[in-house]
């Protein structure tokens, strides 16, 4: 097999290298201060210095702040030795999903001496098709295999690439124009200077004095997200529970962040929607930590909440990982059952006398308070509920979503529907008393097939200007449009609620 040069198998070319968005670059130009523009001739000569390149190896600090809206703020601090004068700096190992317009570069050592003249984001990334396109008009070595009796002979041919349209190259070999030539791989003499193996930020810097400087590049990137996941384990007697909270962090940004300080922002941060948003759909691996004490410190920040991990962590590209957020034990919890009516019941004559079967919903509620073992702002997320069985095993019984919940607020978790309790609703009467004035009567029947008594809350959403004409059970006005009834049902028994309301629309 021939050696030397830059080789690429044509059969596997498209799979060997990756394609990122489309060819091009993002550029931003800044005026040089007049006093700097009038630099002496010696500095002008320094301006022709070769490009400097910095990679992840130069990092001295890295901060990653992730928002639960699919973005993250990256602050990458590096220690560099910078020449004097005007010169380009290539800043590699940035996220592939970077938002170029958000990039900011500054010197932390001597900001007054270091200025950014021009900023470019280079994303004309190397792949097989682009490499061929860049070599149009240039000579390439074609390598193909010829089979002998017991071996393969590798034959090299010099060819001028005339065109490459739709991955169908046209060659000039000697005095002939050749297409469709079978080739095992191509050999290129060099990598074109305007192709990049990874997304790269390129700054043209104007530096007043040579020396070591600590610089910071900050930018926003898409395709990093976090959400909270909770495990609520309810005791057998359904009076206490344990709540464990986890942060699930997902990184599909196209970069890994090694030994980073991690912070999370909970809250709805407003963003101007872009015309086109690229969405990575990469299935990541899940790295789940074992149960551990909470590792985040919480603080308020404007109208949001900031959670800071108390240690550094590494966030690999295409990875999901979980980190303990909180742990509350012996949290008082209350189980309740409910049937919930619909507001349209009070606007129509709904098949008088015909029963409607409705689910009896199972909820758990608890207060997010310090004396109950909690008392910190809870980010929005999924609560998965478990309960111990008679053998002591833990069984999954349902899940629900919660919104961002401040401390001292009550959470209500919908788990599922009761199996052994049946609810039937009947409209017994519907009358029009006058223009826009109606009166209607409803009956709710509950049949309890359990060996213990239960109490079911019936919540009825009534619109308009309403009043309860009569009811066989006590009722409570919850708000302007909702009344509530507590319906006790004996074990293996039946209970009925009858009530009549008058509504003016």
Pin down the residues of each PLM region.
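Bacterial N-terminal signal peptides
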Residues: 12-25
